[in-house]
């Protein structure tokens, strides 16, 4: 984490408030789970990842969507599974199959909502719950992230609604990929800021490279973060991935 924070500082990017660790916010997550449990919106799930992938899913459901195997188990069936020694996860009992959100780049997006995990079998709050509670606690009103998470937005916005949290607005942007159209990795060369600096680029050049990739600067133009904030326009952001010139 310190490396990422240092990279932001080098690029001249700042943030509001202190850096908050999720490991310090466990009471908030458990409070949210209690809210849902009190409304009978949770249930224990004993399925393994392999069992979920092998189970038949509903028509049009995305790969890996939970098929509801443990949703309607009787108390006797739950007791039998508990006796086997397997620690259950806790899932949301979703009341809908889909939910619609507005995205700055994609417009109205309707996506499937399944019974997401709220608490893992090892007792750790799950990602979908944590990010929703974090956004609510910090009054986040806009989320900008990679478009690989677009399908997560409907279920997260639905969960926020159940917890009386105002869902944020969304902007899902294309990813930076390698020449083969895959996620960047160490084998692709200088993919971190430290790598770029070691290769001879300045922080100003790196900032310009990033800004020009989303239409906010001309190649070679020297820009600052405040200038980019003033220029930002979601309509300028390309709708296709940026092929990163790592090597």
Which stretches of residues belong to each language-model region?
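Alpha-helix initiation and N-capping motif
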Residues: 1, 26, 49, 63, ...
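Short, surface-exposed acidic
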Residues: 16-18, 167-170, 217-223
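Residue-level "edge-of-site" marker
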Residues: 21, 48-50, 173, 209, ...
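Alpha-helix boundary recognition
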Residues: 37-38, 136, 197, 211
């Amino acid at each position: 984490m310190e490396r990422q924070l240092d990279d932001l500082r080098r690029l001249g990017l700042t943030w509001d408030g202190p850096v908050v660790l999720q490991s310090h916010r466990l009471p908030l997550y458990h409070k949210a789970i209690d809210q849902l449990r009190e409304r009978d919106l949770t249930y224990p799930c004993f399925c393994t990842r392999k069992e979920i992938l092998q189970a038949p899913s509903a028509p049009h459901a995305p790969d890996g969507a939970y098929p509801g195997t443990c949703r309607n188990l009787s108390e006797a069936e739950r007791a039998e599974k508990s006796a086997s020694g397997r620690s259950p996860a806790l899932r949301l009992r979703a009341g809908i199959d889909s939910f619609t959100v507005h995205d700055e780049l994609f417009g109205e997006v309707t996506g499937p909502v399944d019974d997401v995990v709220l608490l893992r079998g090892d007792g750790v709050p799950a990602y979908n719950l944590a990010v929703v509670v974090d956004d609510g606690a910090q009054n986040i009103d806009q989320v900008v992230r990679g478009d690989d998470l677009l399908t997560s937005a409907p279920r997260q916005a639905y969960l926020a609604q159940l917890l009386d949290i105002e869902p944020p607005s969304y902007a899902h942007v294309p990813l930076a990929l390698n020449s083969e159209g895959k996620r960047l990795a160490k084998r692709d060369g200088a993919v971190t800021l430290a790598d770029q600096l070691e290769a001879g680029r300045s922080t100003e050049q790196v900032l310009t490279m990033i800004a020009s990739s989303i239409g906010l600067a001309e190649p070679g133009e020297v820009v600052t973060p405040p200038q980019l904030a003033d220029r930002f326009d979601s309509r300028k952001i390309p709708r296709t991935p940026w092929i990163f010139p790592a090597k």
